Amino acid sequence: MIQMQTNLDVADNSGARRVMCIKVLGGSKRKYAGVGDIIVVSVKEAIPRGRVKKGDVMKAVVVRTAKDVKRADGSVIRFDKNAAVLINNQKEPVGTRIFGPVPRELRARNHMKIISLAPEVL
């Protein structure tokens, strides 16, 4: 469950290291985002010579949450930290590599490019 002011790690090589959620997209009263949801983030920490700079406002897809993700078969999956992948306006990743595992739920949300770049799909 990601809400406003939540800090997330960045799971790609776009140059950002840490971002903060400033808006959950998908309705005016929507409070929380889960795996596969799109949020608006502000870059809080970035590496030098990266594609993005500190202070940039971008969209991101949530790829890992510490809150359980319940599946249809009754199993749950959870991660140690919250993480996101930065995307552009065409919903394509800004980076060229994805770090760490991503859940299968991204496939149902049509984030196929992230699925194909990920080293492991759980």
UniProtKB/Swiss-Prot annotation:
Gene Ontology cellular component list: cytosolic large ribosomal subunit
SMART domains reported in the protein's UniProt record: Ribosomal_L14 (SM01374)
Ribosomal protein among keywords: yes
UniProt xrefs under CDD domains: Ribosomal_uL14
Keywords associated with the record: Ribonucleoprotein, Ribosomal protein, RNA-binding, rRNA-binding
Gene Ontology MF annotations: large ribosomal subunit rRNA binding; structural constituent of ribosome
GO biological process entries: translation
The keyword rRNA-binding is annotated on this UniProt entry: yes
Highest taxon in the source lineage: Bacteria
InterPro entries per the UniProt record, alphabetical: Ribosomal_uL14, Ribosomal_uL14_bac-type, Ribosomal_uL14_CS, Ribosomal_uL14_sf
Family of this protein: Belongs to the universal ribosomal protein uL14 family.
Role noted for this protein: Binds to 23S rRNA. Forms part of two intersubunit bridges in the 70S ribosome.
HAMAP family xrefs: Ribosomal_uL14
Subunit structure: Part of the 50S ribosomal subunit. Forms a cluster with proteins L3 and L19. In the 70S ribosome, L14 and L19 interact and together make contacts with the 16S rRNA in bridges B5 and B8.
Protein name listed in UniProt: Large ribosomal subunit protein uL14
Native species: Methylorubrum extorquens (strain PA1)
Encoding gene (name): rplN
